[in-house]
Regions:
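Single-stranded RNA-binding regions, centering on S1/OB-family and related RNA-binding modules
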Residues: 1-228
Length: 228
């Protein structure tokens, strides 16, 4: 039993260490709980600081009788962690994750292309769940605070024309590409003998433009550069 408890503690410690390492460079709030003048060190709690912010911004009505953080509002959020396929945000004391595909109008390969730990960004609040005050949940949307540039960019794309781009994903036989002109594109076929993979640079020929979905449809004719 002691070894099981020790293993759980070691696993938790490793998880906390990874979380802290991922947050390197991020500004955080904390409440001082203790002070040791001899060693010139303090004991502080980030959790307590986040709970205080939650009470202030999510649970306490403002002058209009509504909480400051609510659905539809545009607010600032801190980027606390960045991975290839998602980022983690702190929105006034509540943390949430946003998938890379929901970060911008144009598809991206890696969230590190756009975000770094410590960034402060604007997000639109999609939903807030305060049914359990001990576990408030929020859904944040960074993409919708900017205008969608894709319809205008598609105006410059011509059928049967050739463009270069980067593969952002290969899923279920469909190749997702961000063209260098900022247009999203999909291909179901690749004429190159090599297998296309994420982050490869490719040549793409447009066969159809889907303006409803704001994507160019076509064929990958050649892999210009593979990322191995």
């Amino acid at each position: 039993a002691q070894s099981d408890a020790g293993g759980r503690y070691a696993g938790q410690a490793q998880r906390l260490e990874r979380l802290v390492n991922n947050m390197m460079g991020c500004q955080v709030d904390f409440i001082i709980r203790g002070l040791d003048t001899a060693s010139r060190s303090i004991v502080a709690s980030r959790k307590d600081a986040m709970l205080r912010k939650q009470r202030t911004f999510y649970l306490t009505p403002a002058a209009d009788g509504l909480p400051q953080i609510r659905e539809g509002r545009i607010v600032q959020a801190r980027v606390t962690a960045v991975a290839e396929k998602s980022i983690r945000l702190e929105v006034f004391g509540v943390e949430c994750s946003v998938l890379a595909r929901d970060l911008s109008w144009e598809w991206i390969c890696d969230a590190h292309e756009r975000y770094t730990v410590g960034d402060v960004i604007l997000v639109r609040i999609r939903s807030v769940d305060v049914s359990n005050p001990e576990s408030i949940r929020v859904e944040a949307d960074p993409r919708s605070v900017t205008d969608n540039p894709l319809p205008e960019r598609l105006q410059a794309v011509k059928e049967q024309s050739r463009y270069a781009g980067q593969i952002t994903e290969v899923r279920r036989g469909i190749i997702y590409i961000r063209l260098h002109n900022g247009v999203n594109a999909i291909a179901h076929n690749c004429l190159d003998r090599r297998l296309p993979a994420k982050k490869d640079q490719v040549s793409f020929v447009v066969t159809h433009i889907n303006r409803d979905q704001c994507v160019a449809v076509g064929i990958v004719t050649r892999i210009i550069r593979q990322v191995l």
